[in-house]
Amino acid sequence: XXLKGIPTDEEQATGLEEYA
């Protein structure tokens, strides 16, 4: 995932926003 709780474009598209 991305850093600092910010999901990448792919993660947002796939719904993997477990960092938000």
UniProtKB/Swiss-Prot annotation:
Pathway: Energy metabolism; oxidative phosphorylation. Transmembrane segments: none annotated. Its main location: mitochondrion. It is found in: Mitochondrion inner membrane. Keywords: Membrane, Mitochondrion, Mitochondrion inner membrane. The keyword Mitochondrion applies. It is a peripheral membrane protein. Residues 1-20 are annotated as: Disordered. The keyword Lyase does not apply. GO terms for cellular component: mitochondrial inner membrane. GO terms for biological process: oxidative phosphorylation. Component of the cytochrome c oxidase, the last enzyme in the mitochondrial electron transport chain which drives oxidative phosphorylation. The respiratory chain contains 3 multisubunit complexes succinate dehydrogenase (complex II, CII), ubiquinol-cytochrome c oxidoreductase (cytochrome b-c1 complex, complex III, CIII) and cytochrome c oxidase (complex IV, CIV), that cooperate to transfer electrons derived from NADH and succinate to molecular oxygen, creating an electrochemical gradient over the inner membrane that drives transmembrane transport and the ATP synthase. Belongs to the cytochrome c oxidase subunit 5B family. Component of the cytochrome c oxidase (complex IV, CIV), a multisubunit enzyme composed of 14 subunits. The complex is composed of a catalytic core of 3 subunits MT-CO1, MT-CO2 and MT-CO3, encoded in the mitochondrial DNA, and 11 supernumerary subunits COX4I, COX5A, COX5B, COX6A, COX6B, COX6C, COX7A, COX7B, COX7C, COX8 and NDUFA4, which are encoded in the nuclear genome. This is Cytochrome c oxidase subunit 5B heart, mitochondrial. It comes from Oncorhynchus mykiss (Rainbow trout).
